[in-house]
Amino acid sequence: MSGLIVYYSYKNHTRLIAEKISEITGFDLCEIETVDDYTDDYDMLVDETVDNLKSQTKPELQLLDKEISNYDTIVVGSPVWWYTIAPPIRTFLSSNDFTGKTVIPFVTHAGWPRSAIKEANKLAEANGADVKNPIEIQFTTDHDADDLVTSDDDIKSWIGSL
């Protein structure tokens, strides 16, 4: 089985989990980057993205350095923004054909995941994916800390089930 981890990370929380998955599984890593960068100021980001999220704007993405057609399993990681997946992940999931592929979504959040994982599942399934083993991974509410609320054992157990 060939595996790829595709993720978008704003404050490195999602990146940390993606790297842990890669370390344990040996899956390749691929970070999604937008053509136009988001601001580094968190408060400005909130203001900047709330309208985009409501309108489900899909930002333009830079070309990936991996070809998803070469993989059977794709793990997709997103931070939760305003109770949903980040717009770059929305773009990725809605603009790729996942027919014949297993997609395994994970989201990182600070306590308010609401329907983010369901949205990721729905978008992947709408594009042909067989969605399996989604998970929500919680960090503390301190946006600058890398402290997990979800236990490391739970995360490792989930990774082992991939």
Question: How should each PLM-predicted stretch be described?
Answer:
Residues 130-162:
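Glycine-rich phosphate/pyrophosphate-binding loop and the adjoining helix
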Residues 1-76, 83-85, 90, 94, ...:
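N-terminal beta1-alpha1-beta2 submodule of the flavodoxin-like/Rossmannoid cofactor-binding fold
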Residues 38-42, 115, 141-144:
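Short, charged, surface-exposed secondary-structure boundary motifs
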Residues 76-77, 105:
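Redox-cofactor binding/interface segments in oxidoreductases and associated redox assembly factors
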Residues 107-112:
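Short beta-alpha junction loops
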Residues 68, 94-101, 124-127:
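Short, conserved loop/helix-junction motifs that constitute active-site signature segments
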